[in-house]
A protein has these predicted regions:
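Partner-binding and oligomerization surfaces adjacent to conserved cores of proteins
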Residues: 1-280
Length: 280
């Protein structure tokens, strides 16, 4: 990613005010999102299709069937425990699908954050993270992968090579960790217009990290379970722009006043949305 790369978080007016006041973004349970296949997509849909591809290969049937049995059992557990937490951004500032789904039908706002600010200031790596005793390995930011036949083929190839080289131990040495690695980023392809980038976190509740070196809070339980990351430190901030929805109650002057009242500064670009959505 370039030195400054803006991504956009669509929200309601109340959420906008809360973000300004708290100066943090919430990382929430991704399995509670609007896509009911979050995480499950990887461990159920993707895995089922990868299995069919593996069954067409030259892997000995006893090795493959044993591995599939072990992985099937493990994946039933995976979709019920240790969900990833995340905050989602769009790579497009002003599109109707985002306004209607996340921006309160154009009554909200689109907030432009520099994703690289979080890398440089919160020490969040550009990576697809995985559960780890080292906190910096358990959190990362990257683009969402929209499920495709090409991606299925890539995953099947990884599994094939692991099974050929490691036999029945491949499921624990490679296959399970790889699917876990991608589970917070694989989505139903019908959501592709969202052009999503995420910050994803894999905490392990009740277990302390051996190394804590990232600016992320402990678990918060007010309103709902979540973790928090700061987007401002001193005079440095990730918030670079605010796009006001076509039907938003706030004017540019109102937004400027809120920024000043919350000591955000005067260098945030404010603009009006060009999405002329009619509320019916």
């Amino acid at each position: 990613m370039s030195e400054t790369y803006l991504v956009y978080h669509y929200c309601t007016v109340e959420t906008f005010k809360s973000i300004l006041q708290s100066k943090v973004l919430w990382l929430c349970d991704l399995t509670d999102s609007n896509d009911e296949q979050e995480v499950i997509r990887t461990f159920v849909v993707l895995w089922e299709r990868v299995k069919k591809r593996l069954e067409q290969t030259d892997i000995p049937k006893d090795v493959l069937n044993n591995a599939i049995h072990l992985i099937d059992q493990q994946y039933e557990t995976e979709i019920q425990t240790e969900p990833p937490y995340g905050v989602c951004f769009c790579q497009k500032e002003d599109i109707s699908s985002q306004w209607t789904e996340y921006g309160d039908h154009t009554k909200g706002l689109s907030l432009g954050f520099d994703i690289n600010w979080f890398i440089h200031n919160d020490r969040i790596k550009q990576q697809k993270p995985h559960p780890s005793s080292i906190q910096s390995n358990a959190i990362g930011c990257d683009t969402v992968i929209y499920h495709s036949e090409e991606f299925e083929a890539q995953m099947a190839d990884i599994c094939y090579k692991a099974l050929k080289e490691q036999g029945t131990s491949a499921w624990i040495m490679c296959i399970r960790p790889t699917f876990k690695h991608y589970s917070g980023f694989v989505k139903n392809p019908t959501f592709e217009p969202e052009a999503e980038i995420r910050i994803v976190y894999y905490p392990i509740e009740g277990i302390e990290f051996a190394q804590k070196d990232v600016s992320v809070s402990d678990l918060k339980t007010n309103v709902k379970k979540h973790y928090e990351i700061p987007w401002i430190k001193g005079s440095s901030k990730a918030l670079k722009s605010v796009c006001i929805g076509h039907n938003c109650e706030l004017s540019e002057a109102d937004v400027r006043k809120l920024l000043e009242e919350n000591k955000i500064g005067t260098d945030v670009q404010i603009k009006q949305s060009e999405c002329t959505y009619r509320i019916r």
